[in-house]
């Protein structure tokens, strides 16, 4: 089928160099030329937004001599262009301007002199966001935890002063020009196929049903370890630099010997292999250690999608990153979580077997929520006591003590509501930002909306992770996106409940890997998030499993 072949070839000719330059840019490689990624991005956007493909595809689909594979491939491209086409010249202009503005903000942000002021010497100490996060969670002295948190929060004012405001305004202009309420509404429809209103009906229900649990959890920590405990030398558990340390800082330190960075890669490979997860000849490129100039959040990208061409499989080529801060407490478990998370993304995109690369790329119409379900389901395994009993070993090969595992399970349960509501902070804040009128769009109004969202979702004095320090908000690809993690967490609980009810155990069960590959991964984006979750679990997507878990008494 000439049209199908042309689309497959032209798309790969644009997608592959764009993703390769994306990697060079985000990794801070010397080979990355300023503006190179933006140029490739603009070329790809011009292709995917070209409305002239739609009548050609509709006409081709009328043919009676198409093979099943050809019809499926053409239908995939039709949906791809229906989602991505931009007919308005003004909208195309806005897209081009946004790519350039976002690229400049990214370059400026990565050059930011980030760090903390040493509370004893008064000296400014440079530190990455990864190191600051670890310090906030694990440093034994409150003054240093606070200094690290303040270092993270400094990102907020910095991005507001260096280009984020005009980007928000222009994004909203694009969203309205595309026929939506605002940019957030546009992005939700683009990736998930339903409206912002529908999304927040789901999230509002989750917020309501977890409200009492999170307040109870924070109050309990304050009673046991904070100001209400009656102990000497206590700190306020409700301060954002104290809550994480009081709930898990000591546990993180005691678990640390069993999660060495040097063992992370082997444990990821052994665990995924035992689950029956295969990468089908994919080439994986890993960049795992933190360094200056490197993008400060783990991610996966796929320069070469996995797809089938006339019966021949083209394996995926995938890169993913972690930001391990070697020698720091918690760096080993952080690296392992990233390997399971980003390696989960890689497993998903390596197992797509459809007759066009449009089914196996990670952008619209691929669902953000569904993609994150795969990675978050797999990184959830590390928190299971049976996984720890089998894989968590110290340097002498000794297993993690049972009491540490039990404490980890208890902590995970106690903080379940807090953790999912911490995720909720970002979409609620970002929604509020994009709902500001242009005349009200300034740094103070944005910060006020962010603080309102923090106060609504998490009963601390502020969010443990300052909202505008979350890099997703700055990038065009991941802005108005974070709700996908919340929907994914709900789908993870539903998926886990299904497997546990069916098999009794997930650990090292190859039947789990087989079902993931067949029901979740193979179809690519030929089905929606809601359809895929129901196909596997046999039940419509809902918050039921999440709410039941969060509110269950130990």
Question: What does each model-identified segment do?
Answer:
Residues 1-158, 480:
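N-terminal helix-rich structural modules
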Residues 194-197, 255, 259, 324-334, ...:
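Alpha-helix capping and helix-loop boundary segments enriched in small/acidic/polar residues
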Residues 288-293, 304, 310-316, 337-338, ...:
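Alpha-helical recognition segments enriched in aromatics with Gly/Pro capping
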Residues 123-131, 165-323, 398-412, 418:
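Active-site-proximal, well-structured secondary-structure segments within enzyme catalytic domains
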Residues 203-212, 364-403:
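Post-HExxH zinc-binding segment in Zn-dependent metallohydrolases
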Residues 31, 72, 79, 243-245, ...:
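C-terminal, non-catalytic "cap/extension" segments appended to globular domains
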Residues 159-163:
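Amphipathic, heptad-repeat-like alpha-helical segments
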């Amino acid at each position: 089928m000439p049209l199908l072949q042309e689309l497959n070839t032209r798309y790969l000719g644009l997608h592959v160099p764009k993703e390769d330059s994306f990697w060079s840019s985000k990794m801070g490689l010397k080979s990355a030329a300023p503006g190179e990624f933006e140029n490739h991005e603009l070329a790809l956007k011009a292709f995917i937004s070209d409305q002239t493909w739609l009548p050609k595809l509709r006409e081709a689909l009328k043919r009676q001599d198409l093979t099943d594979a050809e019809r499926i491939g053409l239908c995939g491209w039709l949906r791809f262009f229906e989602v991505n086409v931009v007919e308005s010249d003004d909208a195309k202009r806005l897209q081009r301007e946004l790519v350039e503005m976002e690229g400049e903000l990214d370059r400026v942000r990565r050059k930011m002199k980030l760090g903390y002021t040493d509370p004893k010497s008064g000296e400014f100490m440079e530190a990455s966001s990864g190191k600051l996060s670890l310090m906030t969670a694990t440093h034994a002295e409150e003054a240093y935890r606070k200094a690290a948190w303040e270092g993270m929060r400094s990102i907020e004012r910095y991005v507001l002063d260096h280009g984020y405001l005009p980007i928000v305004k222009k994004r909203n202009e694009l969203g309205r020009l595309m026929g939506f309420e605002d940019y957030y509404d546009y992005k939700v429809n683009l990736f998930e196929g339903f409206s912002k209103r529908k999304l927040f009906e789901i999230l509002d229900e989750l917020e309501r049903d977890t409200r009492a649990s999170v307040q109870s959890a924070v109050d309990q920590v304050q009673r046991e370890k904070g100001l209400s405990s009656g102990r000497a030398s206590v700190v306020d558990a409700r301060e954002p630099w104290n809550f994480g340390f009081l709930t898990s800082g000591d546990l993180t330190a005691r678990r640390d010997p069993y999660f060495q960075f040097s063992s992370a890669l082997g444990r990821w490979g052994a665990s995924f292999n035992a689950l029956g997860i295969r990468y089908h000849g994919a080439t994986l490129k890993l960049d795992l250690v933190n360094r200056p100039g490197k993008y400060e959040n783990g991610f996966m990208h796929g320069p070469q999608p996995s797809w089938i061409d006339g019966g021949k499989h083209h394996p995926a080529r995938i890169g993913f990153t972690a930001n391990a801060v070697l020698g720091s407490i918690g760096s080993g478990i952080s690296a392992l979580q990233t390997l399971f998370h980003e390696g989960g993304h890689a497993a998903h995109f390596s197992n797509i077997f459809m007759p066009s690369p449009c089914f196996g790329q990670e952008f619209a119409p691929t669902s953000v929520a569904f993609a994150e379900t795969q990675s978050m389901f797999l990184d959830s395994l590390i928190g299971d006591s049976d996984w720890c009993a089998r894989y968590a070993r110290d340097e002498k090969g000794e297993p993690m003590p049972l009491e540490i595992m039990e404490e980890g399970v208890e902590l995970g349960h106690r903080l379940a509501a807090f953790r999912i509501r911490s995720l909720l902070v970002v979409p609620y804040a970002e929604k509020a930002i994009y709902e500001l009128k242009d005349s009200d769009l300034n740094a103070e109004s944005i910060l006020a909306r962010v603080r309102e969202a923090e106060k609504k979702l998490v009963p601390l004095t502020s969010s443990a992770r300052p909202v505008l320090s979350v890099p997703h908000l700055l990038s065009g690809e991941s802005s108005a996106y974070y709700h996908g993690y919340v929907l994914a967490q709900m789908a993870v609980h539903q998926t886990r409940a299904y497997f546990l009810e069916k098999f009794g155990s997930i650990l090292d069960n190859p039947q789990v890997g087989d079902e993931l590959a067949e029901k979740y991964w193979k179809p690519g984006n030929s089905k929606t998030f809601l359809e895929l979750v129901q196909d596997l679990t046999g039940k419509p997507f809902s918050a039921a499993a999440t709410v039941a878990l969060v509110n269950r008494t130990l």
